[in-house]
């Protein structure tokens, strides 16, 4: 800390200002404001971050000393002002907690009560937000014994004012001789760290990470230092290196990583104007600019900054693992430790952990750098890797070069890992953690820490890839197998499960390079297969899966699965049942690993429907596609059978059906046709809109809520309906619009609530929806007032220009309008209003929300129920949608079309 820094705080000038003023508050506030401005200017000019946070602590020391001196403490008074916690370490960011302990010799606080209260009031009045406690030395001991947080804070302390002997006594009575011996402290801190990591999903790669608390954050470094302080009495990284826990290169890496996070945290506090440790989307762009990250556009600079952030926290996490493992071996070493048990000529088992026989194992036999992970997968009783062996891996990974990558011993070992029954994900994660995976597969190294600036992909590409493999493994076990019953069943029957793991490893490996990542990944996957001498059939399947890993999700979410031609086209891509099984399992795992909160029962239903229909098509033979007329006849026959059994007059049914047209029977099941028909025939002529609601959930975790509306057609029907559903907090995922020859509309919507779940067995909610829709359709003039709702915080940071493409369908007499736009409340209602203004009719819609982006497909016709044929009309329609959905007052970030 500086001894003198008059620019930051001039003691003489401050004392003079205090003497001139009747109240000291103004002088204190002025000094605090000026100091903040000075430090912020120094930060922007590139001043060393360690100096900045130490300078702020020094300044606060001076302010507190001056504030303390405003009160009459006798020179021999047994009371001291002590800095604890981060402030006790001498580290303060702009809005860090200023933790203070007012330390007394005696538990009798009364003699100092008035002065203490007035001192704390002064701190509050001058704008310092402090965390304070008032304790005697004995009370410190009592509370520290019971509370891990208290003992941790007291270990980091400095006397700011008053006698130092009080703090020394406090340290003595809270030492390891009296409480929290090293072993207990380590176990408690390790458990605390695990709980904290779990809170952040056990990953460094959250979309909005916490710079302090997330895995690999500043708290992990502090945990290392706390344990070291308790065990060795040292409290800095260099001292750790002196104890042999860090080599010099590791010490330098940890120190530089800490300083990078300090810069990020300082910038966060400065920009937020408050204590803020979450790297929110609100601040990522500004911090990227502030720290000098550049790119062709804002999105690229953010991604460059975040990739650097993720790689830094990965480095911290790696070293934290190593040091914590080192501590465990030293602090928890049993007194009667059993001798190591040999595993083979290169490795042995030491207290449950694998370690190299000697320091030259990886130098003499480099293939052992892959063998160690295969051994851990083959021997699940192995708890992990000894610290010295982790360090040896890190020190020898430079030996992984092209010769290593083509050595048949290494290629065989790598493939062997994917054939293990358990431990594949765990050991791939270790390989990534220790920097081995990215060295062995340079193309994988490229995606490490690579983020995608959107709400759909909540993990970096490498974390998502390893998550996918984890979910593939877990599909064979409960509870995840219950959520994905078909995928789990198929996973257990795949002839070579290792192939889907390899396809999963490569499915997104082409991201971040210019071009179609599926095509780029397929090229890399083929090169991998050739290098690893996989059979031709295996190679073809892996390459095909990587190349087509998006096809199933795209077809299910963007195309009309009731159209036999859609199923036939997809079946022609798949060709055989084996590919279909592999692709379905990969697709489910991919979507769920991308963002589990965006997986919902309707997506599950669509994928199962596409799988089932394609399976039937493959059994029937690609040369024998379903005939539309035959499908219509089968649906009508089955529906009529249901109705007649229930006592419905078949002549009335035939009369109703004659008004509906072929599309109605292609888009609905026989059960739905019977349900609709029975209700329509019972509806009074003047009964108003008919609104039917039912669950279509056939299996747990699949389905949605179906809303069927039958009413006289009106031009604003769709606009009114979707506006009302928006007001009812319903998310539309599918819409089928039929207009009968008698000018009645038969609309079917599949909806979920805001949690991505169907409405379920909730009569009150069902009645609320029924009444809301009925009232809206009876009073259509009210609908424009109900489409305004506040845009959620995160969505505001993904403003990009809407994309609209319009083309006529080659198979059906409709025009296809594809929309990609920022998700906003009331978006469908706005679209409906535009269709109304352009005198267009909606025939069908596929609605997909992918994070902050909607990917919707609308099948429309003109006022004469014909496809659009006027290019100028199409151009005006495009312009109207783009103008209506553009965010005019927010910066635009150009974004590419999302892929799962």
Swiss-Prot record:
Residues 1-342 are annotated as: Uridylyltransferase. One of its GO terms (molecular function) is [protein-PII] uridylyltransferase activity. Coiled coil: none annotated. The keyword Transmembrane helix does not apply. Its cofactor is Mg(2+). It catalyses: [protein-PII]-L-tyrosine + UTP = [protein-PII]-uridylyl-L-tyrosine + diphosphate; [protein-PII]-uridylyl-L-tyrosine + H2O = [protein-PII]-L-tyrosine + UMP + H(+). GO terms for biological process: regulation of nitrogen utilization. Its EC number is 2.7.7.59, 3.1.4.-. Modifies, by uridylylation and deuridylylation, the PII regulatory proteins (GlnB and homologs), in response to the nitrogen status of the cell that GlnD senses through the glutamine level. Under low glutamine levels, catalyzes the conversion of the PII proteins and UTP to PII-UMP and PPi, while under higher glutamine levels, GlnD hydrolyzes PII-UMP to PII and UMP (deuridylylation). Thus, controls uridylylation state and activity of the PII proteins, and plays an important role in the regulation of nitrogen assimilation and metabolism. Has four distinct domains: an N-terminal nucleotidyltransferase (NT) domain responsible for UTase activity, a central HD domain that encodes UR activity, and two C-terminal ACT domains that seem to have a role in glutamine sensing. This is Bifunctional uridylyltransferase/uridylyl-removing enzyme. It comes from Pseudomonas fluorescens (strain ATCC BAA-477 / NRRL B-23932 / Pf-5).
């Amino acid at each position: 800390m500086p001894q003198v820094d008059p620019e930051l705080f001039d003691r003489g000038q401050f004392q003079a200002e205090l003497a001139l003023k009747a109240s000291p508050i103004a002088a204190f506030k002025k000094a605090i404001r000026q100091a903040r401005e000075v430090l912020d200017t120094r930060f922007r000019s590139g001043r060393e971050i360690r100096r900045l946070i130490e300078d702020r602590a020094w300044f606060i020391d001076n302010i507190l000393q001056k504030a303390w001196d405003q009160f009459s403490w006798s020179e021999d008074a047994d009371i001291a002002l002590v800095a604890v916690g981060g402030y006790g370490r001498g580290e303060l960011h702009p809005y860090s907690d200023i933790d203070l302990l007012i330390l007394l010799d005696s538990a009798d606080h009364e003699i100092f009560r008035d002065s203490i209260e007035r001192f704390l009031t002064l701190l509050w009045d001058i704008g310092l937000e402090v965390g304070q406690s008032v304790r005697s030395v004995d009370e410190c001991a009592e509370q520290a014994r019971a509370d891990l947080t208290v003992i941790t804070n007291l270990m980091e302390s400095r006397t700011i004012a008053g006698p130092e002997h009080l703090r020394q006594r406090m340290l003595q009575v809270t030492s390891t001789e009296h409480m929290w011996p090293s072993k207990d402290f380590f176990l408690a801190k390790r458990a605390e760290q695990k709980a904290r990591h779990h809170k952040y999903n056990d990953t460094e790669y959250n979309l909005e990470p916490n710079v302090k608390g997330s895995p690999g954050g500043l708290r992990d470094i502090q945990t290392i230092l706390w344990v070291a302080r308790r065990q060795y009495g040292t409290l800095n990284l260099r001292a750790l290196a002196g104890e042999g826990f860090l080599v010099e290169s590791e010490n330098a890496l940890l120190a530089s990583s800490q300083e990078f996070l300090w810069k990020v945290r300082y910038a966060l506090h400065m920009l937020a104007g408050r204590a803020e440790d979450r790297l929110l989307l609100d601040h990522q762009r500004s911090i990227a600019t502030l720290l000098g990250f550049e790119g062709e556009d804002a999105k690229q600079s953010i991604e460059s900054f975040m990739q650097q952030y993720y790689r830094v926290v990965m480095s911290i996490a790696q070293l934290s693992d190593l040091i914590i493992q080192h501590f465990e071996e030293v602090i928890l070493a049993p007194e009667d430790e059993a001798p190591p048990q040999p595993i083979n000529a290169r490795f042995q088992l030491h207290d449950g952990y694998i370690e190299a026989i000697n320091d030259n194992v990886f130098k003499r036999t480099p293939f052992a750098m892959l063998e160690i992970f295969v051994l851990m997968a083959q021997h699940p009783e192995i708890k992990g890797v000894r610290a010295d062996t982790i360090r040896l891996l890190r020190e020898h990974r430079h030996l992984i070069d092209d010769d290593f990558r083509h050595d048949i011993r290494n290629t065989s070992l790598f493939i062997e890992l994917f054939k293990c029954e358990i431990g594949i994900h765990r050991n791939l994660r270790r390989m990534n953690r220790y920097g081995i995976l990215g060295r062995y597969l340079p193309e994988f190294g490229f995606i490490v820490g690579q983020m995608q600036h959107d709400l759909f992909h909540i993990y970096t590409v490498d974390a998502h890839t390893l998550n996918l493999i984890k979910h593939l493994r877990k599909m064979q076990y409960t509870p995840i197998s219950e959520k994905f019953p078909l995928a789990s069943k198929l996973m257990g029957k795949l002839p070579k499960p290792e192939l889907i793991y390899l396809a999963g490893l490569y499915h997104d490996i082409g991201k971040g390079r210019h071009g179609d990542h599926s095509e780029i990944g397929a090229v890399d996957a083929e090169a991998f297969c050739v290098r690893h001498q996989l059979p031709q059939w295996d190679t073809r399947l892996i390459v095909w899966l990587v190349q087509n890993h998006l096809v199933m999700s795209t077809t299910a979410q963007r195309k009309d699965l009731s159209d036999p031609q859609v199923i036939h086209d997809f079946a022609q891509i798949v060709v055989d049942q084996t590919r279909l099984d592999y692709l379905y399992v990969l697709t489910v795992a991919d979507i769920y690993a991308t963002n589990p909160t965006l997986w919902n029962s309707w997506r599950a239903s669509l994928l199962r429907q596409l799988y089932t229909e394609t399976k039937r098509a493959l059994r029937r033979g690609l040369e024998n596609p379903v005939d539309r007329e035959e499908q219509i006849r089968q649906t009508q026959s089955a529906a009529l059978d249901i109705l007649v059994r229930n006592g419905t007059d078949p002549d009335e049914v035939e009369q109703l059906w004659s008004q509906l047209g072929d599309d109605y029977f292609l888009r609905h099941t026989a059960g739905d046709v019977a349900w609709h028909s029975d209700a329509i025939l019972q509806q009074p002529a003047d009964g108003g809109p008919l609104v039917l609601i039912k669950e279509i959930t056939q299996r747990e975790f699949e389905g949605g809520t179906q809303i069927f509306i039958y009413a006289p057609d009106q031009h604003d029907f769709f606009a009114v309906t979707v506006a009302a559903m928006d007001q009812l907090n319903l998310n539309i995922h599918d819409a089928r619009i039929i207009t009968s020859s008698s000018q009645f509309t038969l609309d079917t919507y599949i909806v979920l609530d805001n949690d991505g779940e169907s409405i379920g067995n909730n009569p009150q909610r069902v009645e609320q929806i029924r009444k809301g829709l009925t009232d809206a359709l009876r009073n259509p003039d009210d609908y424009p007032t109900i489409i305004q709702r506040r845009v959620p915080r995160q969505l505001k940071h993904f403003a990009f220009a809407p994309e609209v493409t319009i083309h006529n369908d080659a198979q059906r007499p409709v025009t296809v309008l594809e929309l990609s736009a920022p998700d906003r409340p009331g978006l469908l209602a706005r679209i409906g209003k535009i269709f109304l203004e352009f005198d267009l009719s909606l025939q069908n819609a596929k609605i997909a929300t992918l994070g902050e982006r909607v990917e919707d497909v609308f099948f429309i016709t003109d006022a004469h129920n014909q496809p659009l044929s006027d290019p100028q009309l199409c151009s005006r329609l495009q312009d109207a949608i783009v103008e209506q959905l553009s965010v005019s007052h927010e910066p635009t970030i150009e974004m590419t079309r999302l892929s799962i």
